[in-house]
Amino acid sequence: MSAVDEWVHNANECIEIVQVNEKHEKDCQYHPSNTYAIFGDAEVIYGYKDLNVTITYECPLMVPKLEISYSERLAPDSGVEPTDIEGTLNTYLKDRSIKVEGNSFDVHSANSIHNYSFNGKTFKILQATVLEASEIMQHLQIFSLFFIEGGSFIDLNDPRWMVYLLYETTEDDYCLRGYCTVYKYYKWDKLIHDGIRARISQFVILPPFQHQGHGSQLYNAIVSTFLKNPKILDFTVEDASEAFDSLRDHCDYKRLLSMGIFSEPDFHPSLSRQWINSKIAETKLTQRQFSRCCELAFTTKLKKLSLLERKSVRLGIKERIFRQNLDVLLQLDKSERIEKIHNAYENQFDEYKQIVKKLPKLKEDSPRKRQKLAQSSS
């Protein structure tokens, strides 16, 4: 290590997040994934030797305490100003713009929408407006910077924001494992004048608890509230990451499968517009996501389809690609446009083949139904 390197530290590595329960016993610890929004693109803290930065969060309301230790700090006459760690982090650790409600947010009496068990442990998902949960939300804003690529603060004074909090629970403790924020947009509908489009915005499962099924539990619980609310007409996702897209595909596909959508007589490669519209209204998915789930379903049984049915699937995917990229594609000449669409189809199909390896297979159609489907595709 050079003399200069001793004074330079990667912020992601030297910042440690520690959660403690209400008895101040350590619950878990982890590091942020991103700090560029706080310390710049290089994610570097400069001017200290043997630096350790610990942010201790006390559950259940995630009240933070910042501790900084080092063996030596650059002298004022060195000509280089060390990073103001405390001043910089304190800017983000608490959102002071929010009007914290007078009553404390009580996790024990908050609206619980789903409970489940995993590895002998109990988990609970709570639902609240960000105003109701202002006491915890003022401390969670920084987590969108730590764990979401391109994440940013949301307006916690806007009553249209909802938050869903995932806790691991015992008789005495509630320890945070993840959270999701949802914004309720107005959506016009001729039958429902105060219709809502729900948009999933921030979705975070804390690092020690990822890849354990908690993301699917949280997503499915949230979607369940959408489906039960007659004012919510559909729901979408804001700037989803690749990992979240994968989670979403798996959850939405399995939900449609359990609803029997893929077993209906009208579900065949030549889907009618009337059937698609009715199922979009029923599932509250966007047209793009519903089409994607249907395409995944056809891919799971592609080998069992006739040549004519496979062609219908292929043309359906290409038509969707064309519609989604209409403005760009219309600027190309016909031959180049056809090539672009075909290449996009090949990439999409390769992605589907990887996804369906982890999806449950559809039940094979009876010979009588297969004959009917083949005839309807001709």
UniProtKB/Swiss-Prot annotation:
Residues 41-43, 183-185 are annotated as: Interaction with histone H4 N-terminus. One of its GO terms (molecular function) is histone H4 acetyltransferase activity. The active site is at residue 238. It catalyses: L-lysyl-[protein] + acetyl-CoA = N(6)-acetyl-L-lysyl-[protein] + CoA + H(+). Keywords: Acyltransferase, Chromatin regulator, Cytoplasm, DNA damage, DNA repair, Nucleus, Transferase. Coiled coil: none annotated. It comes from the Eukaryota. One of its GO terms (biological process) is DNA repair. It is an enzyme of class 2 (transferase). Signal peptide: none annotated. Catalytic component of the histone acetylase B (HAT-B) complex. Acetylates 'Lys-12' of histone H4 which is required for telomeric silencing. Has intrinsic substrate specificity that modifies lysine in recognition sequence GXGKXG. Involved in DNA double-strand break repair. Belongs to the HAT1 family. Component of the HAT-B complex composed of at least hat1 and hat2. The HAT-B complex binds to histone H4 tail. This is Histone acetyltransferase type B catalytic subunit. It comes from Schizosaccharomyces pombe (strain 972 / ATCC 24843). The gene is hat1.
